[in-house]
Amino acid sequence: MASTQCFLHQHALSSSAARTTSSVSSQRYVSSLKPNQLVCRAQKQSSPQEDDGNSVVVSRRLALTVLIGAAAIGSKVSPADAAYGEAANVFGKPKENTDFLAYNGDGFKLQVPAKWNPSKEVEFPGQVLRYEDNFDSTSNLIVTVTPTDKKSITDYGSPEEFLTQVDFLLGKQAYFGKTDSEGGFESGAVATANLLETSSSTVGGKEYYILSVLTRTADGDEGGKHQLISATVNGGKLYICKAQAGDKRWFKGARKFVENAATSFSVA
């Protein structure tokens, strides 16, 4: 009868043969190698069943189908062919952090929140840079560069002592008069600042101070402002980066933008 047998060229094959009492033989070739190397051909093979006219014919069309199926299995699936994979980022490269953009200034650099925009507003002496949230200008960052006779930031004293010399960064009380405000304010005061945390570090041989301050006003605007200040001295200049966000937005996601901007600040 006409039968179809499959062979794998240039590779070893494993075979098994079994014989039944009725003298019907069959041969099977099994391989775990690449299916696109599979070759099929039709063969003439005699069998006792041919005399009874009950022969089973495997057509060449079936053999061709086997080849097509093997080629399909052996082919590689590209990322473009698997749209669902792109959405899940299964095949793609690890996504880069797009929340921040690198900013290189004159003698300093830092990471700026990608959705914040540059602003021409100048608040403080020596201010050379300002970025703010397009939807809430309370969330912003500034960089100031001013001359100094200090050789290191530690020459200003402790972080707390340094803050008293640059307290203008926290904003000045605009109202002076007799008033008693709720919320723990002293008599006659409508604004307060609490130093929450201080730290110091050395980067590239330069000493840095980082201060976390919570300022509040009697009008309760935003529940207060979280302000992070990073400062250092280099080449006879005092470099300060201050980033801030309102208390409400601070806990709604703005915290990471403020902290990253302040802690990424460094001088060349």
From Swiss-Prot:
Main location: plastid
Keywords: Chloroplast, Membrane, Photosynthesis, Photosystem II, Plastid, Thylakoid, Transit peptide
GO molecular function: calcium ion binding
Cellular localisation: Plastid, Chloroplast thylakoid membrane
GO cellular component, one term: photosystem II oxygen evolving complex
Organelle targeting peptide span: 1-82
A GO BP entry: photosynthesis
Pfam families listed in its UniProt record: PsbP (PF01789)
Function recorded in the entry: May be involved in the regulation of photosystem II.
Similarity comment text for this entry: Belongs to the PsbP family.
Protein known as: Oxygen-evolving enhancer protein 2-1, chloroplastic
Natural source organism: Nicotiana tabacum
Gene: PSBP1
